[in-house]
Structure formats: structure tokens, C-alpha cells
Amino acid sequence: AASDVYKRQFHYWVHLPDYYYDEEEHEYSLLVIIHGTGCAIEEYIKQAKELADKYHMAVLAPMFPGGLIQRDDFNSYKLLSCDGIRYDLILLDMIEDMAKRYPGVHTDQFFMFGHSGGGQFVNRFLLAHPDRLKACSIGAPGRPTFLNPDEDYFWGIRDFKDYFGYDVDLEAVKKVPVLISVGELDNKFIGDSPYGDNRVARMKSLQKNFQEHGVHTELTILPGFAHEAGEKERVQAAQKFFIQYL
């Protein structure tokens, strides 16, 4: 886990419906939104407020700062465990802190959404902490992690234990409903790979891989969108998926 010095550099956003403060007894589900590389999160929170207000949900959005170890590094958080910092455990600390501050928000299990770099985080959090997720939405990660025991982390899970102290609990992962989403036009070349050379191809490969291992996975291809923009449509796709499991 990270030292206290590093932990003090992490912050999180919270949204609760206005009526939270008017109710004597609170019963709220939790949605965690993970930002992408540029840390832009405001638009996703804005779009998620409608979901939260309609369905009695709270929203938590962590902010993972770049440059903690190397000044020009903005990717470490996507790996969850990197350079001695466990970003997944820092997030769980944030969620525990939120539970203390906002009684009635159920934090034992929660929904998780992320696009791009955030999608990488969600993908790997699913494998590291499946017991904490009600359902998750993995949005167009360029470097996904597959359930491949013959390839090292982060593409596969062969040495997963070296990073997290335990192997992937596949039976627990199989209990989590998974949505994979990607823009129809997100087909820009991002490098040669047996999983595909663009994000559309890689998301199809990820769905196939998950399904082959018994993970309930749906793939949504968003018409008219490439990799940027479309925050409203991406959140709406996740909302449609999540409300099945409230």
C-alpha cells in the first residue's frame, strides 16, 4: 500500500441527491466513476447525476494524480499496482471514508464505470476485487487485461499474484455482470497485437475471452463515436446496464 505521504495527495469527488439530507433513513447504492488519462471527470459526474438522483445512488469519483514517482507518468494508476503504490487499495480507503461521512450509502458492493484509462482500471479492478462489484462497465481500454494464464500482467494474469498477493478468483469474477463499450468509430491503429490493432477489435477480443471463461459479458458499440467525447451516451449505456442489478 502507499505511504501516508502519498495518500495525502489523493482526493475524491462525491455527489449525493439533494433529498439525501431530507430523509431520516438513507438507503443508497454507490457508483464509482474512474477518470481517464487526462483526469477529466466533471462531465461524467454531471451525466451520472441523473442516474443517481433517479435511482437513489451516490457517486464517488477518485482523482489519481500523475507524477508521483516519475514526473511525466500519468499511467501508473491504470495498473492498480505499480512502483509500490496500490491504487486499488487507495480507492477502497476512499470508499471506506465515504461510508463514515455519509451513513446509508452501501459500500460493501458497488457499481464501477470507466472509459479509456478509466476502463483499464475497471478491467483490472474486476480481476483484483470481484467481490466488491455489483456490476461494472469497461469503456474502450486500449490496453485491456485478458483472462490469459499464459501471459504476464498486464496483458494476462500469469504473474498476477506477484502484483496483488493472490491469484485471480475466477469463480468470483464470474458472478459480476460486465458491460464492455466502445465507439463504432474507435478504430484508429493503436499498435500490433494478437487481440487487434484498434479498440473496437480489442473490445471484441475481450468479450470473447471473458465469455470463454464463463463471465457474463455484454458488448455495446456506440454508433457515431470514436474515442473522444460521447460522455452522455457512454454513461447512458452503463445506466441501462446497471439498473438491471439495483
Regions found by a protein language model. Give the residues of each.
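Short beta-to-alpha linker loops that shape the active-site pocket of alpha/beta-hydrolase fold enzymes
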Residues: M63-G67, G142, F225
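Short glycine-enriched nucleophile-adjacent loop
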Residues: G119-P130
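Serine-hydrolase catalytic machinery in alpha/beta-hydrolase-like enzymes
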Residues: F10, Y20, H26-D108
